[in-house]
């Protein structure tokens, strides 16, 4: 059995919960969730009235009447809810088409079964309104009795009668509005008559009465007026009620918006009831019994007030429909159609903001000391003045909240009564529905923002005041207690002394009744020795009364009794000729009036949490039963575009207004208000279900739009950050500004991890993360998709897009938990499990089908450009995917800017492209591409090229000696031209053969350039890695200083960065192994100087295995000199062909094939080891040497000699360069360790003349 816990311990344990730190630092930009605390209801509805035996009996009786009237008002509220939320049942029931229909009996039976409970409710409603009118008129009759007319009637009683008047007005309007009620009753009646359910005359009569009651408009009002007019002097009592409402309204003696609007409705409907055949309000005004000009002023200021739900009432309508309006029309300004400034919310915003700022600052001071810092003193240590300040602060806060909520509802009401049209708003279509014209098209941008801001202020302040609820509650109870006790024990002591002394028994009995009702004496009873009780003066030493201090409020009955009894003392009416007021002294009257006025708000403040909720309740912005009724069944429910909460939320999202972005959740909270109201006040599950369905849809839309915006915003931010600053400034000089994105407040929204909506806790951050991840993936997918639909030059744009996405990912990762960028990229690149991705495949695809056959390399610029004369077919690519700007560079302006940047990379393939390819493909991708390129080279060298080599070898002259210098360059040219005639005239040489060689050359060049780019990347890697591997640059030392000492200091400085020892000390075995391997690999890479190009050349050498490349063994055992059997002689012949200058309109071999052709030829020669004999025995070089010597210029067989020689010289330089590069790579494997070349000695050749002898 657990040990017993005392109440004190339990309470202290609960208090300790406040000390618990809550983990998240989520910014508060949403209203408070529904409280899990109980809201205690201290209102006993006078059930405890009989306990106050010491009170004046008359007021206890009045409390009894009050109690039953309050119950009737509650019942009236239930009927109002029933009527307002009534949905037509008969529309859903199948109709009987004709009398011969076989299942009509069944249909009628079902109709009766379904509708009977509903019709019973209507019947009860009819009885209720009958009873309520009788009850009300009975009270009026009692109070207007000639004997009672001068009697005092309490304000509370008059206000209750006013509430009755309001109830009748509301019920009548609801009954008038609901056609579906009448339709349902008619359907029931038809079915019941057919089934002969109503056989007895009484039920038939009742049914008929109900039909008439429902059919007659204003039936309740008419009945009420008829019954009131037979009561003599009824208008006097109604005048009292109206005057009280005017007084309350003028002095702001109301707290919740519904109380304020009730006062106005009672004024209007009260005047309507008074102005009939018996009495005339204008005569009463003339007698100063009522003040119509004041009421007119109020009705002018506030022309439309909420009646019930989305039903509104124009207050002037009560006046316009009254009996004597026409002849007094000119007296009313409220009846004119001009709009009141009250409804221009934008003008009111300055004042609202000022009030908000002032109050929030004041509240923050108290909040910080009470709640946040915990430095607030213990409750018992506060002074009365401090409690009073908190009390005033609570009241002021509630009044502000109520004022703002009322303001929102009044603007909304005005708009519902005054829908827009196509003339007032050009965006409003002709066929717009009534509700749509009242909501969707009826607000300007400024008005929507103003509403959003006010709603945010209301809900934000509600949060702050809710947090201080316990502090406020204690201060309120303490202050109310102190005020009541001080007033009853101290302030009323002097009037009591006077009353006893002057023997004013009535006043004495009332004052003593008050004291007995509320006094909480320190000793437990009234001091017996108090001289005031004997009507004597206090002794000179004074009579000290100690008033205790507690935090206990009075009960509702207690407060009512005290206020009513005090009121009876200062009232202008009294049962006798002389009023009690005249017997009291001036200061006493002022004290009583002051206390009476202040105590008006005590009931509200004692129920602080409930009042706070009522003052912030904006639930009616969603309900639309009245407008649904107007559609006559065409609409079951309106779409979200017409729903106020979504209109405001969507407006913030659509305008992307930064200052409003943090308010977006407050607009969504309107659904919480409506759902709470539907369940707790309307008690209608179907309304809650409709709200829930709308919330599901709206929240999806909200997350979808918000995530899209956030992604687009950060994408533009990334695009702007990475955009070349020089381009931006250049554009600015040209007058085209590329704007940076305006700052927005998405961070606060991204930190929301538990948004409260309809009782669900939603992790907004997670939902946005999901959407943004999808958008990120789509962006990467699109970037790769664009690359796949373009040629190799677009690889630079791909890299740019990936960098922007990487930056976007980095910016978003501050707030969202996204997958790593590399993981996303691999997924988009289809490279998670596959060995190579889409980019690698497309790079090879482009190389194979477009780059190798169609690009010409220029060694001077180190670039490939597209050939002027393509030999391959046009390559068909996929269509480029369409994309919105946020999936590319961010915005249209950025897309344009980046397109112009990447446009300069479009017409060539060079180092920038190769660097990007290296980065994107990585070692694995490069290896795959090179392997595939080697296959291409192999198929060409062992296929078509080999065939051409064989064919051309056959048409080569068997022997072609180099002629002697004496022949002169023209002669030599003619000799070679004649010797190589078959080669020169070979048609396919300059087309297919050269094209195939160009492809081989381009492939080899691609490998070479990739390796050069890769080396740059590697060096960069190595330099970045150096500090972490203890590889430090040698330090500069002055003379006389020791290097090793300085290096040691430097090493110790960088020791914390040295990764391997660090991991060995702190890491797991697996981490240690990885670190060691990584370190070793990086160092090895640095030392080895590995060459990939050498491996590629070695591989290509193995492809040249056919004997035709090398020819037969030389007959002299050394080398072939004059015979044309080796490849280098064939290449010399080819070189002779392309060195012949072309005609004016023909393309040169450089234009058609670029340097790739020469790279292919020279590479084959070098790999065959024929480069030196080629340099010595080449036909063109020989011609060059001779021409250089004799300097002749002739045209031999249409070939200008000098021009040809110039071309030969150019190609000689190119060949030498290529052969040197290739030699360097091939010899790099031999290493530096073999400085001595291997020399083979041959016998010197013997001249023929000597050989024979």
Swiss-Prot record:
Stretch list, region EIF4E-binding: 724-732
Phenotype upon gene inactivation: Mice display greatly reduced lamellipodium formation in response to growth factor stimulation or aluminum fluoride treatment. Abnormal epithelial morphogenesis in vitro, and cooperation with oncogenic Ras to produce invasive carcinomas in vivo.
Swiss-Prot/TrEMBL keywords: Actin-binding, Cell projection, Cell shape, Cytoplasm, Developmental protein, Differentiation, Neurogenesis, Phosphoprotein, Synapse, Synaptosome
Effect after changing residue 726 to A: EIF4E-binding reduced by 20%
GO biological-process terms attached to the record: axon extension; cognition; dendrite extension; lamellipodium assembly; neuron projection development; positive regulation of Arp2/3 complex-mediated actin nucleation; positive regulation of lamellipodium assembly; positive regulation of neurotrophin TRK receptor signaling pathway
Role description: Component of the CYFIP1-EIF4E-FMR1 complex which binds to the mRNA cap and mediates translational repression. In the CYFIP1-EIF4E-FMR1 complex this subunit is an adapter between EIF4E and FMR1. Promotes the translation repression activity of FMR1 in brain probably by mediating its association with EIF4E and mRNA. Regulates formation of membrane ruffles and lamellipodia. Plays a role in axon outgrowth. Binds to F-actin but not to RNA. Part of the WAVE complex that regulates actin filament reorganization via its interaction with the Arp2/3 complex.
Name recorded for this polypeptide: Cytoplasmic FMR1-interacting protein 1
Species whose genome carries this gene: Mus musculus (Mouse)
Protein encoded by which gene: Cyfip1
